[in-house]
Curated annotation (Swiss-Prot):
The modification Phosphoserine is found at S10, S387. This is Zinc finger protein 668. GO terms for cellular component: nucleus. It is found in: Nucleus. Keywords: Acetylation, DNA-binding, Isopeptide bond, Metal-binding, Nucleus, Phosphoprotein, Repeat, Transcription, Transcription regulation, Ubl conjugation, Zinc, Zinc-finger. Residues 52-78 are annotated as: Disordered. Pfam families: zf-C2H2, zf-C2H2_6. May be involved in transcriptional regulation. May play a role in DNA repair process. One of its GO terms (biological process) is DNA repair. It comes from Bos taurus. One of its GO terms (molecular function) is zinc ion binding.
Length: 619
């Protein structure tokens, strides 16, 4: 092939001639001839940009006699007119064929099909590159992973994922990109060009293909099928990432801990766990996030938007992944199986959490009391016992809670009162009945509405070594009191604010709890939870049957636990003795029978610190 000299062709816009080479004014790279300079210009978006964008790339000292890529004269900052303007975006073109070619990016038209596999393309040059993959012509191979490409430009973009190079920086928000096409798409978001809107949820997109991908989250269409396991996906990129799992490919590896990842975005989010960086700030509550997906999910919680609806039961969800997981409840699909006990799970993280039960690993340790946890979320909840943080607030009454599940339970009291027309129930938190020697010591306990909305972890049914009586549970009744201290004699009696039954501070309480009636037997219950639990006792509401003995259960988990009695599988082994158990709850009960080593913090210590009560010293 004959190489053209710089005199035979003029440089592309944004370039100046330096001797016999062409220098890019955007990134200072140099090229020996005009064709290579023109190809590089496309990576900066100069091949099909408007006059205004081209002028921004041209420096004042650009040669006024320079010509653009098509051979047209460029005089100073003015270029040849572009009479063919796109009606959907600010781009303009010199010829009608160029405009028609550009219009396919808006319409999604792909008139060039591949004769081998049927895949279609918008431009003939894209088809030619694709055909090289069928012919096995992939001469450009990555040195870091087994991936190969038919074009050098594709390889260079791919290699930036390994090196972390992101040469395309947005002037408006500072975000940087490795792929010029992704950069151009991002620029449209600042221009506000989102002409394609979803008819179901109103979400708008800059390109038609993005709208098509989004619509599959509503329809449930998953046209991309994995040939290894049969799993289907709504996006081709998701299938590509999934196939790396079968090939054991993790091209993105963390230099700090050595952990590998199949996706660049997952690797970048992981890096922030080492640096502690949380760049995504919620403007409503000030909470910060390390990855954009968690941030978007959190924002939907504020907005209350749940655009993804189950077609079988009508339940709405914020994320398409949540809807896909919910559908498994209807289909009974539990694809994640434990290799040690054959237990199956709906979600992969449920399996990972369950695996810690067998391994006994508790890698997350509290710096205050030394207690260890299998999950980071459990440690986060536990740390609030020490800090007193209660981040979950009720919008109806202002009460705050340590964990979100307690807030949801509390909110049901407001919803049930609205359904029955009765005034909302107020929650009574009966304080822990401390040993007699501790009763009355220390400062007064805080009001129930501000302090002890939830029992701290590990404080249910604690025995008292000194003979005092401790409450076995936290109770909810239809009244509010300051604090209750149970004495050694007469657990049912409570001095102070709580007097005789039905009286609070000497005043009678005549509020009746709401009544919930069973449809089958007309029995009444004080809470909706008790009613639902009772309804499962009816035979017609116990749909899960044991095939060996015929016993029926109200949920699938109960049937799985029961089936182990037939198979003699006891997957939960005590780390202190050879005993094994059918369920994790039975194992936890058994572990309490083993003596606690001296020096191990007791579960009572965090509560004592929270209440501000002095610990008993030696007599």
């Amino acid at each position: 092939m004959e190489v053209e000299s710089p005199e035979e062709r003029s440089p592309a816009p944004g370039y100046k001639r330096s001797g016999r080479r062409y220098k890019c004014l955007s990134c200072t790279k140099t090229f020996p001839n005009a064709p290579r300079a023109a190809r590089h210009a496309a990576t900066h978006g100069l091949a099909d940009c408007t006059e205004e964008m081209a002028e921004a790339k041209l420096k004042p000292e650009t040669d006024p006699k320079a010509e653009d890529a098509s051979g047209d004269k460029v005089s100073g900052a003015a270029a040849k007119p572009r009479p063919y303007a796109c009606p959907l975006c600010p781009k303009a073109y010199k010829t009608a064929p160029e405009l028609r070619s550009h219009g396919r990016s808006h319409t999604g038209e792909k008139p060039f099909p591949c004769p081998e596999c049927g895949r279609r393309f918008m431009q003939p040059v894209c088809l030619r590159v694709h055909l090289a993959s069928h012919a096995g012509e992939l001469p450009f191979r990555c040195a870091h992973c087994p991936k190969a490409y038919g074009a050098l430009s594709k390889l260079k973009i791919h290699q930036r994922g390994h090196t972390g190079e992101r040469p395309y920086t947005c002037a408006d928000c500072g975000k940087s990109f490795a792929d010029p096409s992704v950069f151009r798409k991002h620029r449209r978001t600042h221009a506000g060009l989102r002409p394609y809107s979803c008819e179901r949820c109103g979400k708008a997109y800059a390109e038609l293909k993005d709208l098509r991908n989004h619509e599959r989250s509503h329809t449930g269409e998953r046209p991309f099928l994995c040939s290894e396991c049969g799993k289907s996906f709504s996006r081709s990129s998701s299938l590509t990432c999934h196939q790396r799992i079968h090939a054991a490919q993790k091209p993105y590896r963390c230099p700090a801990c050595g952990k590998g990842f199949t996706q660049l975005s997952s690797y970048q989010s992981h890096e922030r766990t080492h640096s502690g960086e949380k760049p995504f700030l919620c403007p409503r509550c000030g909470r910060m996030f390390s990855d954009p997906s968690s941030f978007r999910r959190h924002q939907r919680a504020h907005e209350g938007v749940k655009p993804y609806r189950c077609e079988k039961c009508g339940k709405d969800f914020r994320q398409p992944a949540d809807l896909a997981m919910h559908r498994r409840v209807h289909t009974g699909d539990r694809p994640f199986k434990c290799l040690q006990c054959d237990k199956t799970f709906v979600a992969s993280w449920d399996l990972k959490r369950h695996a810690l039960v067998h391994s006994g690993q508790r890698p997350f340790r509290c710096e205050e009391c030394g207690r260890a946890f299998a999950e980071r979320a459990s440690l986060t909840k536990h740390s609030r016992v020490h800090s007193g943080e209660r981040p979950f607030h009720c919008n109806a009454c202002g009460k705050s809670f340590v964990v979100s599940s307690s807030l949801r339970k509390h909110e049901r009291t407001h919803r049930s009162s609205e359904a029955t027309g009765a005034p909302p129930q107020q929650e009574l938190v009966v304080g822990l009945a401390l040993p007699v020697s501790m009763a009355g010591e220390g400062p007064a306990a805080p009001a129930s509405g501000a302090a002890l909305g939830d029992p701290p972890a590990g404080l249910l049914g604690l025995p008292s070594e000194s003979g005092g009586v401790m409450a076995t549970q936290w109770q909810v009744v239809g009244m509010t009191v300051e604090h209750v201290e149970c004495q050694d004699a007469g657990v049912g009696e409570a001095p102070g604010p709580l007097g005789a039954a039905g009286e609070v501070g000497g005043e009678e309480v005549d509020e009746k709890p709401p009544q919930f009636v069973c449809r089958e037997c007309k029995e009444t219950f004080s809470t909706l939870t008790l009613l639902r639990r009772h309804e499962r006792s009816h035979p017609e509401l116990r749909p899960f049957h044991c095939t060996q003995c015929g016993k029926s259960f109200s949920d699938r988990a109960g049937l799985r636990k029961h089936s182990r009695t037939h198979s003699s599988v006891r997957p939960y082994t005590c780390p202190h003795c050879p005993k094994a158990f059918l369920s994790a709850s039975d194992l936890r009960k058994h572990e309490r029978t083993h003596p606690v080593p001296i020096g191990t913090p007791t579960p009572l210590e965090p509560l004592v610190a929270l209440l501000g009560m002095p610990e008993e010293g030696p007599a």
